[in-house]
Amino acid sequence: MASSVISSAAVATRTNVTQAGSMIAPFTGLKSAATFPVSRKQNLDITSIASNGGRVRCMQVWPPINMKKYETLSYLPDLTDEQLLKEVEYLLKNGWVPCLEFETEHGFVYRENHKSPGYYDGRYWTMWKLPMFGCTDATQVLAEVQECKKSYPQAWIRIIGFDNVRQVQCISFIAYKPEGY
């Protein structure tokens, strides 16, 4: 087999361009701190560190006495029928199956049978009828809420949106609370 070797030599030459317009000053590092004005606080009071300038007002936290927290949206006032209708329409628009549950004694989570941190009683409620598979009308769901309310006037009623593909509960909110809660 024949092989060939090709050699080429390149010669680099340096030319000094001494035009004043193309000269760039060399990088000499960061500027010294002496060129910047320095203003230091002389007040060593620790309370002055946490000041937000009065621009933000503090928010009130949830009062723990006689104000039970239930489900999603429980920090808001009770939902009106129009607001419930919009929530159920949102639930149906996402393709979730509406389901009604009710609880006659405790409408909130509590600890009675076990004291470990991850365990709560009151998470599981009684289902009202069967889940409403195939339901496309939000007024039909609210009619079931009214029927449940007539049967159990002293019960908490919640609406759940269940995703039957992923098999998870996607939304849950209180639709009715008894008087005094």
Curated annotation (Swiss-Prot):
Single Gene Ontology MF annotation: ribulose-bisphosphate carboxylase activity
Cellular component terms per the entry's GO annotation: chloroplast
Chain segment of the transit peptide: 1-57
Pfam family of the protein (one): RbcS
The keyword Cell inner membrane appears for this protein: no
Claim: Transcription regulation is one of the keywords in the record: no
GO BP term (any one): reductive pentose-phosphate cycle
SUPFAM superfamilies recorded: RuBisCO, small subunit
Domain of life: Eukaryota
Keyword terms of this UniProt record: Calvin cycle, Carbon dioxide fixation, Chloroplast, Photorespiration, Photosynthesis, Plastid, Transit peptide
InterPro entries, sorted: RuBisCO_ssu, RuBisCO_ssu_dom, RuBisCO_ssu_N, RuBisCO_ssu_sf
Compartments, as annotated in UniProt: Plastid, Chloroplast
Biological function: RuBisCO catalyzes two reactions: the carboxylation of D-ribulose 1,5-bisphosphate, the primary event in carbon dioxide fixation, as well as the oxidative fragmentation of the pentose substrate. Both reactions occur simultaneously and in competition at the same active site. Although the small subunit is not catalytic it is essential for maximal activity.
Similarity comment: Belongs to the RuBisCO small chain family.
Subunit architecture: Heterohexadecamer of 8 large and 8 small subunits.
Other known facts: The basic functional RuBisCO is composed of a large chain homodimer in a 'head-to-tail' conformation. In form I RuBisCO this homodimer is arranged in a barrel-like tetramer with the small subunits forming a tetrameric 'cap' on each end of the 'barrel'.
HAMAP family: RuBisCO_S_bact
Protein name per the record: Ribulose bisphosphate carboxylase small subunit, chloroplastic 2
Gene responsible for this protein: RBCS2
